[in-house]
Amino acid sequence: LEKPETGTITIDGETQNLAHIHGKDLTELRKKTSMVFQNFNLFSKKTALQNVMEGLIVVKKMKKEEAERIAREQLKNVGLLDHANHYPRHMSGGQQQRVAIARALAMEPKLLLLDEPTSALDPELVGEVLDTIKKAANEGYTMLLVSHEMNFVKNVATRVIFLENGKIIEDGPPKEVFNHPKSDRVREFFAKINRMVEPEYSI
């Protein structure tokens, strides 16, 4: 969405210089990725089924019948096949985000990008979205997830990166990062989190 000033990215064994990529190469790189946004970004005047079909038809130039078959399959995978003909305004935030995930997975991305996918949800709806993401992870999808859901990250991620002011301050396997952080800042962060979850009273 924004062009980096420097850096490279390697997807599916192919490395690209992000500062110099353009035209056809940029288009092909984008086809290998899918994005799930904080605020769903569904087309409000299209049904759940049509939202999932859109990229398949417009980007992949797929025939409508094949696009619908794949879209229904993905909606079934996220538990929303019975909502195929519902418009976003008739779905909860959690349901809308699951449609957004189905839309992203329908494109068969090599890399799935998720930007705080639960931040716009009521707490009671977070679980259903995290379960959907965990299921996709277990199916072998490669994901880059931005999240403050620490327990989820700890249990699902294979690599954890802590960022502060745009800089990496901790990077490693979840067990190492959560149990033995090297950065003072990360240790401080976990200490604050632990204090927040500890009860301030006893019964």
Report residues per predicted region.
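C-terminal boundary and immediately downstream tail of ABC-type ATPase nucleotide-binding domains
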Residues: 164, 175-203
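ABC family nucleotide-binding domain
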Residues: 1-164, 169-170
